[in-house]
Amino acid sequence: MSDDEPLAIAYERHDRVALLLDTIRYVLEERSLSAEGWDDPQCRGPGMYLVVVSGRSVAEHADPLGDNRWPVEESRDVLADPGAFAAAAERVAYECDGTGVVSVDGVVQERMVRFRDPPSPGGEYADWMGTRHMSALDTSRRDTVIAALTLSQESGRVTVFRDGTYDSVEREAIAARWRAD
């Protein structure tokens, strides 16, 4: 459905979806700022990859990733209880691999997945990008993907990918204007 159709919803400009994306981004930033040891090359911080989708299913371009699951019994809806979402995200960031899938209504799917490469992956990858970030960049180009968000377990960088572009904030710059240090 295109934007010029009367019943089309432009999710990328929808207020509730913007709140959803902001909430997820803030939780990732908080995970980054609360973790310690980022300067230690032997330390592995929390890592996360979440995708916000508008379609009914990601089955045509994603596969379940083993037994990795989002703890839906603790947090099923991002916006219904952001505190519960943050607590679940903390656990997932350290214990699970794969991509969490969130519908535009804020519901988190239980299965963690691995997105397959799009038919024509592309774009320029930045030097700092690992496989999680390259996948997020490519995945963000899919029609049903509103945004992909990552937290780098190597550096604490938080990145929002949309339509093959990205806005990335290094850990040191997260909330820098509000920090007293």
Where are these regions (language model features)?
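Divalent-cation
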Residues: 2-181
